[in-house]
Regions:
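Alpha-helix-loop-beta-strand connector modules within alpha/beta enzyme cores
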Residues: 337-340
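ATP-dependent carboxylate/acyl-activation modules
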Residues: 1-197, 202-316, 328, 350-362, ...
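Glycine-rich, proline-tolerant flexible connector loops at the mouths of alpha/beta enzymes
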Residues: 318-323
Length: 386
């Protein structure tokens, strides 16, 4: 689950990190009123959307008085902001954030995330922070330092020093940076975060280490433990279909292709998408039905897939382990009859009771194309939509 910058900064502040003073609002009138509380005559106006690249897209403005702030806020609020992370449709700006301008001396990059390969927490640091960090990673990867640390109650002083050594700070600012690393580690563990990113982390001309921007994501499977984090969720920033899928315990991510996928298991879902691409088409979604497939769940999955007007065919790929293929097949048949699917439907079943499942599909009277294996399924669904 993603949250907005202003929310992430409040969490950082709670853990003792330095962040610029700021205010947010959903309308310009409230924003101007709240901005008067800030002790500055120069402001940074920021669009609040769940996407990076706002600065290059015109979503960050520096203004020197309230009159200009009002003018820029009226332009930005309601604007469809298109960045390299939003896709061509962009994201509508529905909330704005204003903070005090910082006197920047140096810009750094700092992030903390789960490294699933090593099963450790990885801190990534660089002295090349700012809007061009992606280019730095691509063109000069030696400028980026990765430090992997074990899951513990606290991070060691030695690991903190490794992480910040690329910043080349003096003793005072170095001590602040170490305190920040400890704070980030603590909030990361305590809140089941997947990512904490500070870009840029800055050293001010007053020699203070300040989080100038902040991004956080949290493990959705752990949100039941953190109602205060759950309350920060902004459904306006999420795909309506993904919200609907979560109500039915379906893992769904919308993509840009033409073949809808319904699969059990994330690994099998990834393999299914790969083989669709191998046969020359693109998957329209990632959809994992998990370990159960009642008529209601399959019906919900079909409706979500078919709500995407780009879908020209559907591939169901099920390996029966915990899930019985005959139960899944009956759910598919019942749901297909109820919804009246008008695009080609290819089903591949393997595992527990797969023969019984195939018979249910064959005797359904529906135009369901049966496949023997994953390659056969991908080939048939690609041919069917031509």
């Amino acid at each position: 689950m993603n949250i907005h910058e202003h929310q992430a900064k409040q969490i950082l502040k709670k853990y003792g990190a330095n962040v610029p003073e700021g205010v947010f609002a959903f309308n310009v009138s409230d924003l101007l009123q709240k901005t008067k509380e800030l002790k500055t005559d120069k402001y940074v106006l920021k669009a609040q959307i769940h996407a990076g690249g706002r600065g290059k897209a015109g979503g960050v403005k520096i203004v020197d008085n309230l009159e200009n702030l009002e003018k820029e806020a009226n332009i930005l609020l309601g604007k469809n902001l298109i960045t390299h992370q939003t896709g061509p449709l962009g994201r509508e700006v529905k909330r704005l954030y204003v903070e005090e301008v910082s006197n920047i001396s140096k810009e750094f990059y700092l992030s903390c995330l789960v490294d699933r390969v090593s099963s450790k927490i990885a801190f990534i640091s660089s002295d090349q922070g700012g809007m061009n960090i992606e280019e730095v990673a691509q063109n000069t990867p030696e400028k980026i330092l990765t430090t992997k640390v074990d899951f513990n109650q606290e991070i060691s002083e030695a690991d903190c020093k490794k992480i910040i050594r690329v910043f080349e700070l003096d003793d005072n600012s170095g001590s602040e940076a170490i305190s920040l690393i400890k704070a980030i580690y603590k909030l990361f563990i305590e809140n089941d975060a997947n990512l904490v990113e500070i870009n840029p982390l800055i050293l001010t001309k007053e020699n203070k280490v300040v989080c100038l921007d902040a991004k956080m994501t949290f493990d959705e499977n752990a949100l039941f433990k953190h109602p205060e984090i759950q309350e920060l969720r902004d459904y306006n920033e999420e795909e309506a279909t993904e919200i609907e899928a979560s109500k039915h315990d379906l893992a769904y991510i919308k993509l840009d292709g033409s073949i809808g996928c319904m699969v059990n298991g994330a690994g099998l879902a990834m393999a299914t998408m790969d083989i669709i691409k191998l046969y020359g088409e693109e998957p329209a979604n990632f959809l994992d039905v998990g370990g159960g497939a009642s008529k209601e769940k399959v019906s919900a999955a079909f409706k979500i897939i078919l709500s995407d007007k780009n879908v020209k065919g559907i591939l169901i790929n099920i390996f029966g382990g915990i899930m019985r293929c005959d139960v899944l097949a009956q759910g598919v048949v019942d749901a297909a009859k109820e919804i009246k699917i008008e695009v080609p439907l290819v089903v591949r079943l393997a595992g527990t009771n797969f023969e019984e499942g195939k018979k249910i599909l064959e005797n359904s009277g529906l135009k369901i194309i049966s496949a023997n294996d994953l390659s056969d399924a991908a080939k048939k669904v690609v041919e069917a939509i031509k």
